[in-house]
A protein has these predicted regions:
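Short, acidic, metal-binding catalytic loop of nucleotide-sugar glycosyltransferases
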Residues: 18-30
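Conserved donor NDP-sugar-binding/catalytic core segment of glycosyltransferases
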Residues: 81, 86-119
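Active-site donor/metal-binding and catalytic loop motifs
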Residues: 180-202
Length: 220
């Protein structure tokens, strides 16, 4: 039952191998795509690499849509190790099917220096338009919804607001459902080797980013 294509940020094998192994062991995964900067040359067994300039860009979202050929599309948005809870993906699929949601997201734990803290998220209200709304780092979309929303995305090529634009498009026609359960953990390991290339973190106050978010919001 390979129902999910997964898309995972990738800077090198050490950073992503535990995340990939955990996804592969669920038995629900069709393909895993590693999202990497153009000069990243490493790979992981059983995965394909998609090279892109920014994981948040419109081009990245269209690329993901073009490689989404399973029933569900999972995007993981962090470089930290993802550790899924028991039957977490089954639970997400079950609720997506029962609710008819276009996207589901869940509460999670964050583990830093061995210390676990709860990191709950809140229910999405229609009209929750803030670009900093916290969905957590695991977003599970129905693929038909994802593709349809990506096809309606703003023709402007966003560098920073692609994922935000997609989320706004999904919310226009579909529900975004919060699963009020702790289904996964984000585990901070400092496995990154010096010089390893990652997508640049962009400060939310960055002016270019703010302008793009405002454009996406206005167009919505």
């Amino acid at each position: 039952m390979n129902k999910i294509n997964c898309f995972v940020p990738f800077s090198g094998a050490a950073q992503a191998e535990k995340t990939v192994k955990g996804l592969q062991e669920t038995g629900l995964v069709n393909n895993i795509y590693l999202l990497a900067l153009p000069d990243v040359t490493e790979n992981l067994p059983g995965c394909s690499t998609l090279h892109m300039q920014s994981i948040q860009s419109s081009a990245a979202i269209r690329d993901i849509a073009g490689h989404s050929d399973a029933e569900y599309t999972l995007i993981y948005t962090k470089y930290t190790t993802l550790e899924l809870g028991l039957f977490a993906l089954e639970r997400m699929i079950h609720i997506a099917e029962d609710s008819g949601a276009g996207m589901v997201y869940a509460d999670r734990y964050q583990v830093k220096e061995g210390k676990q803290t709860n990191a709950p998220v809140i229910d999405y209200q229609f009209g929750s338009l803030r670009d900093d709304f916290d969905f957590g780092s695991v977003l599970l979309f129905r693929t038909d919804t994802f593709k349809e929303a990506a096809a309606r995305m703003n023709e402007d090529e966003y560098k920073f607001a692609g994922l935000y634009d997609l989320r706004l498009k999904v919310s226009q026609n579909e529900s975004l459902v919060h699963i009020n359960e702790y289904l996964y953990s984000e585990i901070e390991d400092d496995t990154r080797k010096s010089g390893e290339k990652i997508f640049d973190y962009v400060d939310p106050r960055n002016r270019d980013r703010q302008i793009e978010m405002e454009q996406a919001f206005t167009e919505h």
